[in-house]
């Protein structure tokens, strides 16, 4: 493709409203343009990136035995009412009515539609498994769309679905998709991790997220250095390997703690470590108030609380609720004689001699033994993991890092098929409910994540499988007949070798072409100018390393083949 005939409106500066680096560079590289809040136009170069990602996804999905279909973006509200998600999904579901007052929504996902399709067709276990997928535009009415393609309202997604007759079959489908996702993200040249994850609004029995590692990632993941355990911090289990206290605990005593609302203020006042303090946090769980206890140097993981109580909504209680329940302002709540259910983090079990709030202003209790002095409803893993924790699987060293979620697979179980009566007859003629899995990849999000992970001060540094072109060919002297003729010869040669090449044939200064070549992030650069041709060479540059070299113009096919393989191997061995 020729630069002069391809619409690539590059920018020298980043637009003021662009926040993250992928958003800035996608705009500067002329790959996308904002239409309105959360909606983007994919320009030719950006669409090439999206299509290359989608092609890799399709190839691996087909290889895994999933078959492509295409479902409508507009979905009838009646299907969502069958599963209860019409009421529970929230304002992110864009609802509307047609001229006949029938309710519809723009699909953020397609579980209801695919289940309706399959329940209308499948009657016997002999027709299972059914494994289907689509690459489709989705819409989620985000309250604050931001970060460009990272969190837009409209986005491109691959969503796949499996229907099985048995739990064993469903687990096989899930494993097939897990392996396919590992292949997809490996082929795309991204550094990533598969992590255990919460099922969120999709629901189901368990799930894995696929995270592109990047310092700018919105999610934090915890992984073990000594085994394969990795999980989103929302899901990460905590292994407490301490020993319960064996010493006796003195009688509980009320003490004055004026103005000590926080753990930091309390430790300074009493001279005790934060680990000797128990925080009592009040939450509203589906409208009912509960208390959660964690050590003073820990944080509550509200997702774990939500899962423990099988709740729909969990939020921190406001100051008015705290005052009403404890008769004290925020900072002085405690578990003793508290008239709401109390859930304590397992790390506290067996421990004694704690400092807790006294449910009275400017007062705390010391020498508290939770088993003796408080009515704990249940003990459970309720705190957020830290880098100081041991691996829950092998006891090894844990590390926390940032990541960008680009894929998510779910073992849905019976969540949708039971609600929508998706049934079949088994080999004994007995009616059974289909067991489902669903599998998503944010295709447009992958493009942004690839840039978040791979960029430098000059622009994008695309991995070869994601880049819009493999090579950019720079004509430094388009007014020279000799240079033009050689450039055309090289252009034809590269195309004949099966190389995707962008020919920069613009009548621009060399400096402009060099800057744009770096900005676009195309992995390989070839530079043709009069001086080089006079020496019989073509200059080359590896965009990732910045390493420059020279290739013989006389044996360019062989030299380019060897050099390009070196560039690809460099990416593979990162």
Swiss-Prot record:
It is found in: Cytoplasm. It holds the Pfam family tRNA-synt_2b. PROSITE patterns: AA_TRNA_LIGASE_II. CDD domains: ProRS-INS, ProRS_anticodon_short, ProRS_core_prok. InterPro entries: aa-tRNA-synt_IIb, aa-tRNA-synth_II, aa-tRNA-synth_II/BPL/LPL, Anticodon-bd, Anticodon-bd_dom_sf, Pro-tRNA-ligase_IIa, Pro-tRNA-synth_IIa_bac-type, Pro-tRNA-Synthase_IIa_type1. This is Proline--tRNA ligase. GO terms for molecular function: aminoacyl-tRNA deacylase activity; ATP binding; proline-tRNA ligase activity. The keyword Cell wall biogenesis/degradation does not apply. Catalyzes the attachment of proline to tRNA(Pro) in a two-step reaction: proline is first activated by ATP to form Pro-AMP and then transferred to the acceptor end of tRNA(Pro). As ProRS can inadvertently accommodate and process non-cognate amino acids such as alanine and cysteine, to avoid such errors it has two additional distinct editing activities against alanine. One activity is designated as 'pretransfer' editing and involves the tRNA(Pro)-independent hydrolysis of activated Ala-AMP. Homodimer. HAMAP family: Pro_tRNA_synth_type1. It catalyses: tRNA(Pro) + L-proline + ATP = L-prolyl-tRNA(Pro) + AMP + diphosphate. PANTHER family: MITOCHONDRIAL RIBOSOME PROTEIN L39/PROLYL-TRNA LIGASE FAMILY MEMBER, PROLINE--TRNA LIGASE. Gene3D superfamilies: Anticodon-binding domain, Bira Bifunctional Protein, Domain 2, YbaK/aminoacyl-tRNA synthetase-associated domain. The lineage of its organism: Bacteria, Pseudomonadati, Thermodesulfobacteriota, Desulfovibrionia, Desulfovibrionales. Its EC number is 6.1.1.15. Keywords: Aminoacyl-tRNA synthetase, ATP-binding, Cytoplasm, Ligase, Nucleotide-binding, Protein biosynthesis. The keyword Kinase does not apply.
């Amino acid at each position: 493709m020729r630069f002069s005939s391809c619409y690539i409106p590059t920018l020298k500066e980043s637009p003021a409203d662009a926040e993250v680096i992928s958003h800035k560079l996608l705009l500067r590289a002329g790959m996308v343009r904002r239409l309105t809040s959360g909606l983007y136009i994919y320009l030719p170069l950006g669409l090439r990136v999206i299509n290359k990602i989608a092609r890799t996804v399709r190839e691996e999905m087909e290889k895994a035995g999933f078959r492509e279909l295409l479902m409508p973006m507009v979905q009838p509200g009646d299907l969502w009412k069958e599963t209860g998600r019409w009421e529970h999904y929230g304002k992110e579901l864009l609802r509307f009515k047609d001229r006949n007052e029938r309710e519809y929504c723009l699909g953020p996902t397609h579980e209801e539609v695919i289940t309706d399709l399959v329940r209308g067709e499948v009657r016997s276990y002999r027709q299972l498994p059914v494994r289907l997928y689509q690459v489709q535009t989705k819409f989620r009415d985000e309250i604050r769309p931001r970060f460009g393609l990272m969190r837009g309202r409209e986005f491109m997604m691959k969503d796949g679905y499996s229907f099985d007759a048995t739990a064993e079959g469903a687990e096989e489908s899930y494993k097939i998709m897990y392996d396919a996702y590992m292949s997809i993200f490996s082929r795309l040249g991204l550094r990533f991790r598969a992590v255990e994850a919460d099922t969120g609004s999709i629901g189901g029995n368990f799930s894995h997220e696929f995270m592109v590692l990047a310092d700018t990632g919105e999610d934090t993941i915890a992984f073990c250095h000594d085994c394969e355990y990795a999980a989103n911090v929302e899901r990460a289990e905590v292994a407490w390997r301490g020993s319960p206290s064996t010493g006796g605990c003195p009688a509980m005593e009320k003490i004055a703690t004026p103005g000590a609302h926080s753990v930091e203020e309390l430790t300074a006042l009493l001279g005790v470590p934060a680990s000797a303090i128990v925080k009592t946090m009040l939450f509203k769980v589906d409208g009912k108030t509960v208390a959660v206890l964690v050590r003073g140097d820990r944080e509550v993981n509200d997702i774990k609380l939500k899962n423990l109580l099988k709740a729909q909504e969990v939020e921190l209680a406001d100051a008015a609720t705290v005052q009403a329940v404890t008769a004290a302002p925020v900072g002085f709540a405690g578990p003793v004689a508290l008239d709401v259910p109390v859930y304590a983090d397992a790390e506290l079990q067996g421990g004694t001699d704690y400092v807790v709030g006294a449910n009275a202003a400017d007062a705390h209790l010391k020498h508290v033994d939770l088993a003796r002095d408080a009515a704990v409803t249940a003990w459970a893993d309720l705190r957020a993991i830290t880098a100081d924790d041991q691996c829950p699987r092998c006891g090894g060293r844990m590390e926390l890092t940032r990541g960008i979620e680009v894929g998510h697979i779910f073992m849905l179980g019976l969540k949708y098929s039971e609600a929508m009566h998706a049934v079949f007859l088994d080999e004994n003629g007995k009616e059974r409910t289909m067991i489902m899995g669903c599998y998503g990849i944010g295709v447009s999000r992958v493009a942004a994540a690839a840039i978040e992970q791979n960029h430098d001060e000059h622009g994008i540094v695309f991995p070869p499988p994601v880049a819009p072109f493999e090579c950019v060919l720079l004509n430094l002297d388009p007014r020279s007949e000799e240079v033009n003729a050689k450039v055309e010869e090289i252009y034809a040669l590269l195309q004949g070798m099966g190389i995707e090449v962008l020919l920069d044939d613009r009548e621009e200064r060399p400096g402009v072409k060099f800057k744009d070549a770096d900005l676009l992030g195309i992995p390989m650069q070839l530079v043709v100018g009069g001086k080089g041709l006079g020496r019989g060479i073509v200059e080359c540059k590896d965009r990732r390393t910045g390493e420059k070299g020279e290739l013989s113009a006389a044996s360019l096919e062989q030299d380019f083949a060897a050099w390009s393989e070196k560039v690809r191997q460099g990416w593979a061995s990162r």
